[in-house]
Swiss-Prot record:
Domain of life (superkingdom): Bacteria
Family according to the record: Belongs to the glycosyltransferase 28 family. MurG subfamily.
A matching Pfam family: Glyco_transf_28
PANTHER family in the cross-refs: GLYCOSYLTRANSFERASE (PTHR21015:SF22), UDP-N-ACETYLGLUCOSAMINE--N-ACETYLMURAMYL-(PENTAPEPTIDE) PYROPHOSPHORYL-UNDECAPRENOL N-ACETYLGLUCOSAMINE TRANSFERASE 1 (PTHR21015)
Reactions listed under catalytic activity: di-trans,octa-cis-undecaprenyl diphospho-N-acetyl-alpha-D-muramoyl-L-alanyl-D-glutamyl-meso-2,6-diaminopimeloyl-D-alanyl-D-alanine + UDP-N-acetyl-alpha-D-glucosamine = di-trans,octa-cis-undecaprenyl diphospho-[N-acetyl-alpha-D-glucosaminyl-(1->4)]-N-acetyl-alpha-D-muramoyl-L-alanyl-D-glutamyl-meso-2,6-diaminopimeloyl-D-alanyl-D-alanine + UDP + H(+)
Pathway annotation: Cell wall biogenesis; peptidoglycan biosynthesis
Protein name as it appears in the record: UDP-N-acetylglucosamine--N-acetylmuramyl-(pentapeptide) pyrophosphoryl-undecaprenol N-acetylglucosamine transferase
InterPro entries: GlcNAc_MurG, Glyco_trans_28_C, GlycoTrans_28_N
EC number: 2.4.1.227
Role noted for this protein: Cell wall formation. Catalyzes the transfer of a GlcNAc subunit on undecaprenyl-pyrophosphoryl-MurNAc-pentapeptide (lipid intermediate I) to form undecaprenyl-pyrophosphoryl-MurNAc-(pentapeptide)GlcNAc (lipid intermediate II).
Keywords: Cell cycle, Cell division, Cell inner membrane, Cell membrane, Cell shape, Cell wall biogenesis/degradation, Glycosyltransferase, Membrane, Peptidoglycan synthesis, Transferase
Keyword Nucleotide-binding attached: no
Length: 364
């Protein structure tokens, strides 16, 4: 009997592709063959996959882009992708098919349904994306990166967590130094593109803190390129020691050394914060599809590990009060850190592997 084949189907964004890559790496180590089914955009994110993973570009499309003619052709392009996937599966039958969301996962999952192959999906956010919502009732397992996750009626989810980078795992459960009368670190993360609203509000909010906190505070603030100069100037005017960059290559280290994190609540940011275990103030991106960033934050907020401030309610005064509350109460901050850690899933990849192998065993 040959080696089992895992077919991974994922859309063309980093949010879909990173957990797919983590699973691919783990399954290759366990002796499986792995194929990745994605579109041309997704293939650009596939450079980090193990070199033994075969990448198949599929015909897919989205209704979100293009003019009327392009939208009219979407069903035909998807149908062509499904037919191609069915033919490919008949030639080389996957043991399990895993979808990570995005329109490019439609052909492989549709083919798996048609051929009654073992199949599962992984959703990174607290609200199912359009494609995962479509397939949730049609797969044997729905793995959730964020918990709780809003699921269709009758569908049960399994909280695996979101796989994170090795650099984050190396800092998992790093000892938390509570706020005190010594140098403290505050980290501001705006997601992959920075966040203008955090650049607008955070510097002024910090400047309003009591002097006994400001005297010890060191700030690392991720901002958009066009905002770096004005944010730096705002901190300088307030006499604050701040490092402002568009991207920090050592975010895991900075998180592990932080007394408090102010962040958007993208799925990967929430996973990093919970696995390292740090108190957080979360400001969900208001324009996120289906308000999924608010859903992402819900688990940490309900665990009393994070404070949620809707973007519409974010102002310097309110934010300053929340920052001061965390940094002036060391026992409460320590408990928030513990609660975050308890909510995390550092073994997310291993949990996904277990589900894949369980489905494969059921088939044999």
């Amino acid at each position: 009997m040959g080696r089992p084949l895992l077919l991974i189907a994922a859309g063309g964004t980093g949010g879909h592709m990173f957990p797919a890559q983590a699973l691919a790496e783990a399954m290759v180590r366990r002796g499986w063959r792995v194929k990745l089914s994605t579109d041309a955009r997704g293939a650009r994110y596939a450079g980090g996959f193990p070199h033994v993973v075969e990448i198949e570009e599929v015909s897919s499309a989205t209704f979100a882009r293009g003019g009327p003619l392009a939208k009219a052709l979407v069903p035909l392009r998807i149908a062509g992708g499904v037919a191609s996937a069915v033919a490919g599966f008949l030639r080389d039958r996957p043991s399990v098919v895993v979808g990570f969301g995005g329109y490019p996962s439609i052909p492989a999952l549709s083919a798996a349904v048609a051929l009654r192959l073992p199949r599962m999906i992984h959703e990174q956010n607290g609200v199912l994306g359009r494609v995962n919502r479509l397939f949730a009732p049609r797969v044997q397992a729905v793995c959730c990166g964020t918990w709780p996750t809003d699921l269709p009626e009758g569908v049960e989810g399994y909280y695996t967590g979101n796989p994170v980078r090795a650099a984050v795992l190396e800092r998992a459960a790093a000892p938390y130094i509570v706020p005190g009368d010594y140098p403290m670190s505050l980290v501001v993360i705006g997601g992959s593109q920075g966040a203008r609203v955090l650049s607008d509000v955070v510097p002024e909010a910090i400047a309003r803190l009591p002097e006994e906190i400001l005297a010890n505070l060191r700030i690392a603030h991720q901002a958009r390129e066009e905002d770096v100069a004005r944010v730096t100037e705002a901190y300088d005017r307030a006499g604050l020691l701040a490092e402002v960059k568009t991207f920090f290559t050592d975010i895991p280290r900075r998180l592990s050394e932080a007394q408090l994190v102010i962040s958007r609540s993208g799925a990967s940011s929430v996973a990093d914060i919970s696995i390292i275990g740090r108190p957080a103030i979360l400001v969900p991106f208001a324009a996120a599809t289906a308000d999924h960033q608010t859903a992402n934050a819900r688990g940490l907020v309900e665990a009393e590990a994070a404070i949620l401030i809707p973007e519409s309610a974010l102002d310097p005064g309110a934010l300053s009060e929340h920052i001061a509350a965390v940094l002036s109460q060391p026992d409460a901050a320590r408990q928030m850190a513990r609660n975050a850690l308890a909510h995390g899933r550092p073994d997310a990849t291993e949990r996904l592997v277990e589900v894949v192998e369980h489905l494969a065993r059921k088939e044999t």
